[in-house]
């Protein structure tokens, strides 16, 4: 649940543009379009994230790093 809370806080602070930029970077790093569908499913419901498997944990960490960097630059 801590992971889900951190995702929601990042998405709320950065807004829709921040999340879309994070997703585009994730595609480049993973090289798998399926990661987008899994990640978007997380916003609709927690089942979407849990259904992606353990590899999605790395995607979450990447998104958190991107969110932190953007916070420091913005504010």
Swiss-Prot record:
Q: Where is this region: Disordered?
A: 1-20
Specify the domain of life of the species encoding this protein: Eukaryota
Q: Which family does it belong to?
A: Belongs to the UPF0512 family.
**What's this protein's name?**
UPF0512 protein D
């Amino acid at each position: 649940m801590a992971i889900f809370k951190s995702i929601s806080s990042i998405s709320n602070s950065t807004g829709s543009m921040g999340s879309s930029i994070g997703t585009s970077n994730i595609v480049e790093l993973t090289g798998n379009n399926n990661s987008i569908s899994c990640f978007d499913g997380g916003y609709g419901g927690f089942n979407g994230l849990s259904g992606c498997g353990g590899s999605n944990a790395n995607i979450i960490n990447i998104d958190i790093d991107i969110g932190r960097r953007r916070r420091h630059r913005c504010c």
